[in-house]
Amino acid sequence: GPAGPTGATGATGATGATGATGATGATGVPAGRNKIINGNFDIWQRGTSFTASGYGCDRWRSYYTGGTTTAYTRQSFTLGQTDVPNNPEYYTRLVVTSGNAAGSRASFNQKIENVKTFQGQTVTVSFWAKADATKDLTVEFLQYFGTGGSPSAYVTATPQKFSISNTWTKFTKTFSIPSITGKTLGTDNNDYIDLAFWMDAGSDYNTRVSSLGNQSGTFEFAQVQVEEGSSATDFEYKSIGETIQDCKRYYMHLLNIGGGGYATGSGQTARAYTYATFPARMRVNP
C-alpha cells in the first residue's frame, strides 16, 4: 500500500438529520454533503493528547516516520472568540519536529471509506488553519485500492501546496479526483480515498507533495469539509450524538455498555463466554 496511514478505513459520509446550528449551511444546500466524519473535532474517544503515530481525535490520524515526531493534542477555543465562526468548541494542534531527512514525513489524515467516492469528479476542500509562523502546507488526495488479490497501485490527485500564517484563515482548494476506470479492487474490502495535510516531507516524497520539504513547527486545524463540486459551502454542523454514532462505526470505547447481556460457562471446558450488544454496527468485526 501507500507510504501513508494504515488501519480502519474512513467513512462514506454523513447521513441523516443535520443537528446543531447552521447544519444545512446556505439555503438549498443538501445535508450530508461533507464526507469528512468529525470535521469539527468534537469527538475524542481515545483521549486528548498523543505522541505515537496513529489515531487520536476520532477518524483523524497523525502519521510520521523517518525520524520526525509529532505531538497531537485537543485544544479548546476561547469562549466568545470570533476568529473561527459558529462557535466551535475544539481544534486540533500538531507540533512537528522534523527528522530533516529524505524519508522524513508528518501528515494529518482522514480516510473516506470506498475508493469509488468522488472518482472522476471535482471536489472542494475547505478548512481553517494556522501555524506558529508562516509555513507551507500541502493537501493531497490518494486513492487506495485495498489489499487481497491483485489490486491496482494507489493513485494521487495533483497535490496543492500553499502557505499558512499565524492567524486563523479559511482555505478553499479544489481538486480533480482521477477516474478509477480500468482499476482493480482488492478483495479485503479496505479500499478508501485519503485526505492528507502534509506538514513535513523530505525529498523522497517530492512528487506527492509538490516538494514541500522538511520543516518543524506548530500546525492547527478546525472545521474540515470535503464536498462534491467546485465551490465550498458553509461548514456542515452535525449534532454530537449523530457524530459519535458515525465515529463508532470505526472505533468505540466499550465502557459501561448500556443494555442487556449474558454469560455462559461450562465446568467441563473451564471456559466462560460473555455476550453484549454493541451500540453501533461496526465496519468490520472488532
Segments from the language model and where they lie:
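Extracellular and organelle-lumenal recognition/adhesion modules and their flexible linkers in secreted
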Residues: 2-286
